[in-house]
Structures are given as structure tokens and as C-alpha cells.
Amino acid sequence: NVNIQGGTKRMRYFTSAEYYNQQGLFKEFSQDEYGNKSNSSFKRFAFRANLDFLMTKDLTLSVNFGTRFEERRGPNSNESRDGTYSQAFYEMNHTPGWLFPVSYTVGEGEDQKTLYSGSSQYQNNIVARFAKAGFYRSTNTINETNFIVDYKMDWLTKGLAAKGMVSFDYDAYYMRAFNADFATYELNDRTNYNSIDAYTQFNTDTELAYLGNNQTTTYKL
């Protein structure tokens, strides 16, 4: 966060610039080839400028402008986190930790493949959901501007003043979401664990599918 202020006899100014970056609680598991992350993140870029123009000893004109750009990313397709995170914590509480490892590795060299563990009863691997089940991304741009006229009338009555203000606000929100199904595997033949034939597959890996978007734009005067 950087602030700069100053001025002259006829003008005063204050400016502020901010960058904020917050990451989620989870490790990065994503295997998305497009570079989208499985962990949640929130970024904000903000700028503000306040300008006061002393037109006369009694008349002051002010312009205040603020803008911020926010970006949110997260796993799966539920920006409210009610779906993905609630389901993750539910599965952690209801899946025995000793039942199976998080994943298996089969094959050798460049042919190695990660298989996410599961069973006929517990097919929803939490790590697999974060790594492969999709993501959302939303952006929000907010502009706030106001114009103020302040006129002191001490010449008429001491302490008397008139002030007027006009404000204009702009808010644009856009969110898009993608989703995919994922497979889990149960090891049946422990003597041949390096071969995919030793596993029973539940569900199927699918390509990311576009779920749609949500877009709103608001103007206020």
C-alpha cells in the first residue's frame, strides 16, 4: 500500500495505490493443462485519488475517484464454496483415513500415471476433486466517483456554508465456471500394483466442460 499526498495554495491531492494477494488453505493439486489452480485465491488492485481545488477563499471544488479490480479463483464450479469445501470437509469426517492412500502411481518413466484412490463405497477422493473436477474464476471492477462543491458564506453569517455532491458508481461482475468428472481406483491385486490391470475403476475422467457464466453491470447516480 503506497500513499502520496501534497499540494499548493490552490490545490491539494491525496493518492493511494494498493495490491493485495491472499491464497487459500489447501495445497496445490491441480493437473489442469491450462494452468488453472485448484487452491482458492483472492487478488485486489485498488487506486484512489482525492483532489481539492481552492477556487477562491470561499469556494472549494473536490473530485474523489476510487477504483478497484478484484479477482477470485477456486476449485470446482461453486464460487460460494458451499459445494466444494463443504463436501471436502464432509468426506474428511466420513472417510476412514486408513482405508486407502491418496493415490497410486502405475507405469514407469514417461508412462507413469497417477491413479486417485477410492472404493466402491468411497468414490469421492477429496484430492482428486481439487485436482481434476474443474474451477471457477470471477472478476469484479468497481469505480466510485463524486464531485463536491463547498461554498462558505461567512460573509453572510459566520459558520454558514452550502455543500453539494454528485456521485457516480460503476460495478461490473463476471464469473465463469468449468466442471469435469474424475475416476477413482481400488487396488485389488497387491502383487501387481504397478499395472493398471490390478485396479478396479469407478467413474470416468472427462474433459473440462463449460458450465456457463454470470454477468452483471450496475450504474448508480
Residue map of PLM features:
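Flexible loop and strand-edge segments within Gram-negative outer membrane beta-barrel domains
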Residues: N1-E18, Q22-L25, S38-Q123, Y136-N140, ...
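Membrane-embedded beta-strand positions of outer-membrane beta-barrel proteins
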Residues: T15, V63, F147, A162-G164
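Intrinsic disorder/low-complexity detector
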Residues: Q5, K113, I148, T191, ...
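Active-site-adjacent bridging/hinge elements
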Residues: T114-N125, S195-T204
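Low-complexity, intrinsically disordered or weakly predicted helical/coil tracts enriched
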Residues: N50, N146-I148
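Surface-exposed, low-complexity/disordered Ser/Thr/Gly/Pro/Asn-rich loops and linkers
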Residues: A128-F130
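Small-side-chain secondary-structure face that scaffolds active or pore-lining regions
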Residues: Y20-R44, R72-E79, G134, S138-E144, ...
